[in-house]
């Protein structure tokens, strides 16, 4: 099955008996094999439908394959790149493949849902924020324990040239 967040189709093995050869979406060659795959409204040699990351032949795996950002992915690589689900960590709603997202510690958010837990202001790329136990805080509303050093800090990716607290992140 192919999951494209906004639409689904199945990967189907089709017999090519008696029909003119189809062009493979992977290699462009004619498919003269007895069986071919039909996925994402295109035909594929069984050897050509591959994960864009690990090159696993998806016709052989017999499980789901996913497409996002122009890539065809096996389940493991989809989860590695885009998180466990295509759902927003804040609202639980699905996130369309074409939509921009915000990420924090492996969690994925709609842009509109990436807000401070205290003041509810939306954080935008470039804003500094604190991510404490799965909760987002803006710079102004960070928990007072962070100021006093009482909360365990999370690791962060420091912004070049700017000093940051251990739990501080940059969108």
Swiss-Prot record:
Region (Disordered): 1-21
Highest taxon listed in the record's lineage: Eukaryota
Gene3D superfamilies: Cysteine Rich Protein (2.10.110.10)
A GO term, aspect molecular function: metal ion binding
Annotated Polar residues bias: 1-19
Tissue expression remark: At the start of gastrulation (stage 10), expressed in the mesodermal marginal zone. Shortly after (stage 11), expression is down-regulated in the dorsal most region. During neurulation, expressed in the neural plate and ventral epidermis. At late neurula stages, also expressed more rostrally, and then in the brain, migrating neural crests and ventral epidermis.
UniProt protein name: LIM domain transcription factor LMO4-A
Species this protein is from: Xenopus laevis (African clawed frog)
